[in-house]
Swiss-Prot record:
Coiled coil residues, start to end: none
Protein's recorded name: Metallothionein-2B
Binding site for a divalent metal cation 2: C6, C10, C23, C26
Residues annotated as binding a divalent metal cation 1: C5, C6, C17, C21
Molecular functions (GO terms): metal ion binding
InterPro entries: Metalthion_crustacean, Metalthion_dom_sf
Role of this protein: Binds six divalent metal ions. Known to bind copper and cadmium.
Domain of life: Eukaryota
Keywords: Cadmium, Copper, Metal-binding, Metal-thiolate cluster
Family, per entry: Belongs to the metallothionein superfamily. Type 3 family.
Region (Alpha): 30-58
Organism field: Callinectes sapidus
Length: 58
């Protein structure tokens, strides 16, 4: 049986898997924009550089 959170993908929370979700295919989309607090020029860079991308974004 798959984890309850794993339907098509895990439920996401602040750029990471929702607490308690265990899913190999969990890929939470990064935020559209990083704020100035995150020194990133693109959302891809933000998702790699920032520990919690969505918390870094407005």
């Amino acid at each position: 049986m798959p984890d309850p959170c794993c339907n098509d993908k895990c439920e996401c929370k602040e750029g990471e898997c929702k607490t308690g979700c265990k899913c190999k295919s969990c890929r939470c989309p990064p935020c559209d924009k990083c704020s100035s607090e995150c020194k990133c020029t693109s959302k891809e860079e933000c998702s790699k550089t920032c520990s919690k991308p969505c918390s870094c974004c407005p």
